[in-house]
Amino acid sequence: MESSNLGGGGGGGGGGGPPPFLIKTYEMVEDAATNHVVSWGPGGASFVVWNPLDFSRDLLPKYFKHNNFSSFIRQLNTYGFRKIDPERWEFANEDFIRGHTHLLKNIHRRKPVHSHSLQNQINGPLAESERRELEEEINRLKYEKSILVADLQRQNQQQYVINWQMQAMEGRLVAMEQRQKNIVASLCEMLQRRGGAVSSSLLESDHFSKKRRVPKMDLFVDDCAAGEEQKVFQFQGIGTDAPAMPPVLPVTNGEAFDRVELSLVSLEKLFQRANDACTAAEEMYSHGHGGTEPSTAICPEEMNTAPMETGIDLQLPASLHPSSPNTGNAHLHLSTELTESPGFVQSPELPMAEIREDIHVTRYPTQADVNSEIASSTDTSQDGTSETEASHGPTNDVFWERFLTETPRSCLDESERQESPKDDVKAELGCNGFHHREKVDQITEQMGHLASAEQTLHT
């Protein structure tokens, strides 16, 4: 019944019936056998082409004698169909509805519109509003273009800066590697040059301490010697226990490069200070080896042979102190060693003639004058002794008491005297220039006898 109506409508197409394209399209969509390819949409107000390939291969040749899907879509557009779903091929028209074939006659083919007639229609009242919209769109596009151009310039500038920073970092990395190699090379060279001098100086100090063959005693504190030994040991610590190189940090930014450069600069300064300290130690060692006495602890024998002008505060051990009970034994032992030592020179006894010449008597004084002169000489000697004691300070009283009560002995044996002639000269001067207290008392008694003899001759 429906097909007959469609046929009647098609037969009367010349008298205002629906076009054949619309009739064939309606029959194709209405066929239930092809619903998997094309079918009505939800509600029957549209149709959907589910499989365009099968539609072009099977249905179009059957109904329209061609297989061009695009041509079929253009035909739909000429009859006023529109695509209502962008995700699929679904088309609709207000008069193309399922079960309402009588509405197909209301669908007409659009006539082609020429460009001249279209321009004439556009030049109406819609031209101003459309122009304003276009101008706004143009201005918006220009603004967006300017933003994009500025962003592009900024990106190019950042890229240039990044490339420059990368080149600078590569140059700094190469310079740091070269500086690190130079530091390692200079350190190796310094250790090779200075290691022998330091070891020899340490061996020499050990040799000096062993050659004395005297037990170590803390007689006095020598700050200068302690400072020099500390310098030597500090230099040895720098040479042998040098700090390890800092670990290589991952190069991520400029801060890591700055930290590495600071560490390299600190290492360079450290090695420079070590080199200066090593040079100073070498100069000190060369001066000490050339004749200067090394700054080591002085033994008790050197205290005896030290000259009076040095002003060194000498302190005796408890075993040799005059107040100790072993003073007599020590005096006997010192006297025996002094007489048996090869460098001993006995002080000659002064004859009466020389004693008379020392007094420088220009006239024969009276008994009162002699007594006053003896008293004045005694006071003068006491004043001189007090001035000497005051000049040397209270710390040298023990030394002078030992010097006046005990016989000094030489601290150097024959082999040491051959190696250090200066010490021999000091020992001989000490032995020949100092007299013990018994000799002084004897001279005083002789002076008393001389005074009495002069008094007798004068009377």
Curated annotation (Swiss-Prot):
Exhibits temperature-dependent phosphorylation. One of its GO terms (biological process) is regulation of transcription by RNA polymerase II. Residues 127-189 form a coiled coil. A motif (AHA) lies at residues 397-406. Residues 364-388 have a biased composition (Polar residues). Residues 141-191 are annotated as: Hydrophobic repeat HR-A/B. It is found in: Nucleus. Keywords: Coiled coil, DNA-binding, Nucleus, Phosphoprotein, Stress response, Transcription, Transcription regulation. It comes from the Eukaryota. Induction: By heat stress. GO terms for molecular function: DNA-binding transcription factor activity; sequence-specific DNA binding. InterPro entries: HSF_DNA-bd (IPR000232), WH-like_DNA-bd_sf (IPR036388), WH_DNA-bd_sf (IPR036390). Residues 364-398 are annotated as: Disordered. Transcriptional regulator that specifically binds DNA of heat shock promoter elements (HSE). Belongs to the HSF family. Class A subfamily. The hydrophobic-rich region (HR-A/B) corresponds to the oligomerization domain. AHA motifs are transcriptional activator elements. This is Heat stress transcription factor A-4d.
